[in-house]
């Protein structure tokens, strides 16, 4: 069976959930070979093996932390030369999509971004994408070179499948471009205790209808009662009510949680583009004609200032 390269997203050896989802999808089309880079790379091996990696290629160098994405592209290119894989899978984060695009260019290959499913095909892996605000589902394959595919978080359930997970050192020669853009400093974000927006199983978002930064407290309260991440529409972000890092939509982040609750969001196509692949969508809006209701599984026509606090209290009561 052909091998499939999986780029590992980890923090000092702690593997992030989207990578485990990639391993599940990779097993459908071949044998997963994980590529772990940077500090703690070797510490990822046990987790990766538990979830199906037959091999774990590791390489640690200061360049991965000191410079932007090019060193990681160099490493993936080296892994591609060592393995000759059937495909390369990368998490569909902002960094992941840049890595994938640069790698595809170097390999002279095609790229598919924001896939929500993956299956084996007679002529190579077939990726499913949700497009035009979930109006259509497309199936695509790369017709030239090794397919490079980014997959959206929450596209697959994480499934354990113990494998050998043999650790091998990857030999990497960095290109001249690798050190072209140096990281001069990092400012840690203040922790809210909530899950990462793009990885959360539940997302509660507020829009123009929240009508003020101070009113986002009721959105946060509902999110905290559910253990959810907080999102915001572009209108809310542009008004200065919530940080841009929490914006969901075409010019923000793309999410695909199990449950998405839209409060006071009309449902412009730009917002829908960022949450259309959510498994279950609930909308709360006092305008019964709001476009968001065309997309939802469950809709509540009502004032969010009445509905959201009542929902929060009911959830708390049921949780005891």
Can you say where each PLM-predicted feature lies in the sequence?
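N-terminal glycine-rich FAD/FM-binding segment characteristic of electron-transfer flavoproteins
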Residues: 1-320
């Amino acid at each position: 069976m052909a091998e499939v390269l999986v780029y590992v997203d980890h923090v000092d050896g702690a593997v992030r959930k989207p990578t485990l989802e990639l391993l599940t999808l990779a097993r459908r089309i071949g044998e997963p070979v994980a590529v772990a880079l940077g500090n703690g790379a070797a510490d990822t091996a046990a987790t990766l093996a538990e979830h199906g990696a037959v091999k774990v290629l590791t390489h640690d160098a200061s360049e991965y932390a000191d410079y932007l994405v090019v060193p990681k592209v160099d490493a993936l290119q080296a892994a591609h030369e060592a393995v000759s894989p059937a495909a390369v899978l990368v998490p569909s984060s902002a960094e992941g999509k840049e890595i994938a695009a640069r790698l595809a260019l170097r390999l002279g290959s095609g790229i598919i971004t924001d896939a929500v499913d993956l299956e084996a095909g007679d002529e190579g892996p077939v990726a499913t994408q949700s497009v035009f605000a979930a109006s259509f589902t497309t199936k695509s394959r790369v017709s030239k070179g090794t397919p490079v595919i980014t997959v959206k978080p929450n596209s697959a359930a994480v499934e354990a499948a113990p494998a050998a997970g043999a650790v091998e050192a990857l030999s990497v020669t960095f290109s001249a471009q690798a050190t072209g853009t140096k990281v001069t400093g990092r400012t840690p974000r203040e922790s809210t205790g909530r899950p990462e927006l793009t990885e959360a199983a539940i997302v509660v978002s507020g829009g123009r209808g929240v009508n003020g930064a101070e009113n986002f407290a009721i959105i946060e309260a509902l999110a905290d009662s559910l253990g959810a991440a907080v999102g915001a529409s572009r209108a809310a972000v542009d008004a200065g009510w919530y940080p841009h890092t929490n914006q969901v939509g075409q010019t923000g982040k793309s999410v695909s949680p199990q449950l998405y609750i839209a409060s006071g969001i009309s449902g412009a196509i730009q917002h829908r583009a960022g949450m259309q692949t959510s498994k279950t969508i609930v909308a709360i809006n006092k305008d019964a004609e709001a476009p968001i209701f065309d997309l939802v599984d469950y809709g509540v026509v009502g004032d969010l200032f009445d509905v959201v606090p009542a929902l929060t209290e009911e959830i708390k009561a049921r949780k005891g």
